[in-house]
């Protein structure tokens, strides 16, 4: 497995390696994409350290995939991969998203502004703890807050221009008073 740190720039996590499946090096793979079969078309995947993984075989089993990676020939080697997150470079992904769909990597770093254009901070992360997506926002003050990534709180997302517009009240950043 080759090492390539350059591929980690603007990466998108597509899968997480799970437990071994059988004795010949296959692993269960939790795919984080809505189109699991597309995973093999991306070619080489990379982990956090830049090591590469080439899919030799992929077949679906319920919500998971069973995958065989080149060079992983036994259960012990497969077990050593457990928990590794697999990424692809953002520029390899197809841009066939709908108007309300975004890749997480495209949201991180966007300026956050209110309806008047006042810059409040920038997006520093995206989370989902089960009740809906939350944007992590680093305010201009240095404080970090979570805001709902909903149509009520986030009024506009403009990836090309590098900003998103929030309603400070709906986002929980203001109580609606004048000094906010």
UniProtKB/Swiss-Prot annotation:
Record flagged with keyword Chaperone: yes
GO molecular function: ribosome binding
TM spans (from-to): none
Gene3D superfamilies: PRC-barrel domain (2.30.30.240), RimM (2.40.30.60)
Biological-process GO terms, alphabetical: ribosomal small subunit biogenesis; rRNA processing
Main location: cytoplasm
Segments forming domain PRC barrel: 99-172
Subcellular location: Cytoplasm
Protein keywords: Chaperone, Cytoplasm, Ribosome biogenesis, rRNA processing
Record-linked InterPro entries: PRC_barrel-like_sf, PRC_RimM, RimM, RimM_N, RimM_N_sf, Transl_B-barrel_sf
GO cellular component: cytoplasm; ribosome
Family statement drawn from the similarity comment of this UniProt entry: Belongs to the RimM family.
Matches recorded under PANTHER family: RIBOSOME MATURATION FACTOR RIMM
Role, per record: An accessory protein needed during the final step in the assembly of 30S ribosomal subunit, possibly for assembly of the head region. Essential for efficient processing of 16S rRNA. May be needed both before and after RbfA during the maturation of 16S rRNA. It has affinity for free ribosomal 30S subunits but not for 70S ribosomes.
Domain statement: The PRC barrel domain binds ribosomal protein uS19.
UniProt subunit comment: Binds ribosomal protein uS19.
HAMAP family in UniProt: Ribosome_mat_RimM
Name this polypeptide is given: Ribosome maturation factor RimM
Origin species: Bartonella henselae (strain ATCC 49882 / DSM 28221 / CCUG 30454 / Houston 1) (Rochalimaea henselae)
Name of encoding gene: rimM
């Amino acid at each position: 497995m080759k090492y390539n740190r350059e591929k980690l720039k603007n990466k998108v996590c597509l899968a997480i390696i799970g437990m071994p499946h059988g004795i010949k090096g296959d692993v269960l793979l939790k795919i984080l994409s809505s189109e699991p079969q597309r995973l093999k078309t991306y070619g080489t995947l990379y982990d956090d350290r830049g090591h590469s993984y080439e899919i030799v075989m992929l077949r679906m089993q319920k919500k998971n995939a069973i995958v065989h990676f080149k060079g992983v020939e036994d259960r012990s080697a497969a077990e050593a991969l457990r928990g590794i997150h697999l990424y692809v470079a953002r520029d390899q992904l197809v841009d066939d998203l709908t108007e309300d769909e975004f890749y997480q990597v495209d949201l991180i770093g966007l300026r956050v502004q209110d309806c008047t254009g006042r810059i409040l901070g920038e997006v520093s992360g995206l989370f989902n703890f089960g009740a809906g997506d939350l944007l992590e926002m680093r305010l201009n003050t240095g404080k970090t807050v979570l805001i709902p990534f909903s149509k009520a709180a986030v009024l506009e997302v403009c990836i090309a221009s590098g900003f998103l517009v929030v309603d400070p009240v709906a986002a929980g950043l203001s109580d609606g008073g004048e000094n906010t």
